[in-house]
Amino acid sequence: MDKNLIVDYINQNHFGKLLGMDFEVLSPGVIEYKMIVEEKHLATPFAAHGGAIAALIDASLGVACLSKVFSEAKVVSTIEFSMKFHKPALKGRLLIAKASVISAGKRILVSESKIYDGEELIASASGTFNAYPKEKAGY
């Protein structure tokens, strides 16, 4: 496993840092992404903006795929994802996105993710990703 590519990704992911997101690779293709809902994420006095939740779920889908292909010196980009919101994400709560790759070809990967607040399902999604050589992304 080329752990340096994951470290490089963490260091270069300025958007994830801005939103306060952090992830852990549990195994190739399986990750958890975490974010505490803060004031900067809110659309109402109590609930996160859907875009903040969409960013977390897209990141989790993508990093699950990245963790599957980075040992091949590849990175991924989102082709598409479909998402459902189930409950609001409330201020101060820790959200955990659990994502895994369900299909992996040479170039196309599909992943699924669910965001939880404790045991409450907040959102779910599936996405399709393109894998390509890391040099094309500047790594």
Model regions: which residues?
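Terminal targeting signals and extreme-terminal segments of soluble enzymes
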Residues: 1-139
